[in-house]
Amino acid sequence: MKKLQTLWMQEYPQAIHEGFIPDNLRVLVMAPHPDDFDAIGVTLRFLAENNNFLHVAVIRTGSGVDDSYLPDLALAGKADLREREQKNSAHFFGLPEHKLTFHSLAKDEQDHLLGNAENYHELMEIVADKAPDIIFLPHGNDTNNGHRVTCSLVRQVAARYSRPIVLFLNRDVKTIAMRTDLYTPFGQEMADWKAELLRFHDSQQQRNLVTRGHGFDERILLLNNQIARDLGLDALFAEAFELEFYNVSADAK
């Protein structure tokens, strides 16, 4: 059984850097929506280039697609659209097709994710199958239902899982508050790459242009710029994470 001693013994906050995360640690991204993967794309690109095992599990949803984007498109069709957008962005990222899976979980009539036993067991099956050491997902202290419920369920899974595991909870545009333990700083060249990655989610790009006056790409990068300024970094941008360790014994410290 692998132990997460390297991460457990660190002092925080600090930047993710070369050699910080051992390449034998397995990484799972648990995305409540298509595009949550892309929102932390720079960190995940670093891990892919670090040769970590990387799998992305995306919860299917049709939320966030305005009726005006494709008139007469039903909720199931919107979910299919968002799945195609995620597949296209993952292809641009360089993620192999078999490393990206989509999962239909129980929702209410408004397409809100339910925090029920059925969904808990579905997520437990994903974790048991992929056997991750690290799970990335949006922080649960968030105004978005999907982020809150997914985080709650994954925390339950992690607490009852048979192996040590650490959650990397990322700061999102809808995060209310969180502690920053790790961050990935980056400059303009990487920001341009990330913006292109984000624009594959055209339904979200167009919705943000209409409702906010700027695109989805700019919305995420504005957050990344704010994170860098909050941390007092020289870098223009950063992605930020709070860590939660589960099943790591004190004697491993």
Regions found by a protein language model. Give the residues of each.
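The feature marks non-catalytic terminal segments
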Residues: 1-22, 85, 91-98, 110, ...
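Active-site beta-strand->loop->alpha-helix modules in alpha/beta enzyme cores, enriched
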Residues: 1-165, 196, 248-251
